């Protein structure tokens, strides 16, 4: 077609189209709260408005115009072997579905800055009166989830200093929750349940660094329907030193699966010595997904590291490791199918509309459920008696049986939680009761924190558990006994204290994982591998300490660059990475088959 004819057609088309003018958006408004009413201004995100604009269906004129332009002018040919420059398009964002909007649409998470014990006490009392969900706390802050409509009531119960000392941590809880679900398949409760969830590499897998794509399992949070086959696959591939066991049965009848990893003498004539065992658990609170992924990461690293990493091989010859990815399978499954922020188990209580018991408050040592006995709706409900929670009772029975029947000596217990980056040691129920081996607990705790810091530069505080869930104040932080009224939640009846006191596990810790910043329990999937790496490094340091305490410091300081977590199997010695390729390739191929 002659150029003049093309130009005439184009000008004719252009003259018939409506004029559109670009109007700049107003400046972003601040998101503030007032004790006298709802939010003073709704949060306006210009970038979001642009993204929403790009998602609108093009008009008939626009489609006709584009079609004519393409037919008249043609499209530029793409060069062989290289990509054309991508168009400058705004990134589209999928919005949270109606089911999530209905459940969480009016909820936000506020972070309060705490300056003294009086403020702590006032915040605790107000939270109890309004039945608020206290997410977490650290030395000088407390995070609380609540509905926007409740904000005026909360601020009205607080002293003037707290009415202005807060900021929104999560402004759009429904959207943040929606984005936390696995990307592959369906992971949101608005679509299909966890039983039909299939895992596959994320869209960005091909662009990731090589050491970050060795196992697609850790590219996202995995539901129970993927976790269990993955554990079976590990056992089938590494049966020489890995077995799948059950440590109990849940309230809904599910097994509580665990991986036992260790190398035992092959000489049957030789009497087996008492086996030293380390338990690493996660998922006690269902919504703390990062704890499940981290236990799985450590288990995978230990299992695949045997025979290739000198450190791991030595540790597995010295100890058995029992990895329990989720102590609370019922609750964990429920977070994928129904309520992402569910905390307790799914056991029936005296109130049919308030099911669930807090597993970490149901253990027998220093159980004190009086504070929540009359309120099964409380997030910290401990039941009406010790060990009323089925899962806590089952795991305690398994542990006792291991000691009395199977000649097991538990030497360490590590319970992973989130969030706030803290390493906590006994006791949790009271700061007045000091452990007999306090110095050893503090020494190893400091070693774990240092190993993490050397691995990822992340800082984890080391303190007694009784201080870990108490918002510290500007007074004497080393006082022997913090005011009991300042406890943000009950600390009695914890697994940490029970294993330490009743089972005599001398090195018991609760580690609160990432982060301290903006995500709370909704840590993005990009943090799965970094968190796993740093805690894996800490568990290697713990094993070395238990083998020979005096070498811990020099081991951490003397880590060679090749041993830092730059590779996926991050404890490999020089020259050992290549030896892992064949075995890891076979395992990855089997894992790929699992999704089909």
From Swiss-Prot:
Residues 23-184 form a propeptide. Binds 1 zinc ion per subunit. Residues 187-207, 583-596 have a biased composition (Polar residues). Keywords: Cell wall biogenesis/degradation, Disulfide bond, Glycoprotein, Metal-binding, Secreted, Signal, Vacuole, Zinc. One of its GO terms (cellular component) is vacuole. It is found in: Vacuole; Secreted. Residues 564-580 have a biased composition (Acidic residues). Its cofactor is Zn(2+). Residues 1-22 form the signal peptide. Disulfide bonds join 354-377. Residues 220-546 form the Peptidase M14 domain. Glycans are attached at residue 370. InterPro entries: Peptidase_M14. It comes from the Eukaryota. GO terms for molecular function: zinc ion binding. Substrate binds at residues 285-288, 343, 360-361, 418-419. Residues 182-211, 557-596 are annotated as: Disordered. Its main location: other. Zn(2+) binds at residues 285, 288, 417. Inactive carboxypeptidase that may play a role in cell wall organization and biogenesis. Belongs to the peptidase M14 family. This is Inactive metallocarboxypeptidase ECM14. It comes from Arthroderma benhamiae (strain ATCC MYA-4681 / CBS 112371). The lineage of its organism: Eukaryota, Fungi, Dikarya, Ascomycota, Pezizomycotina.
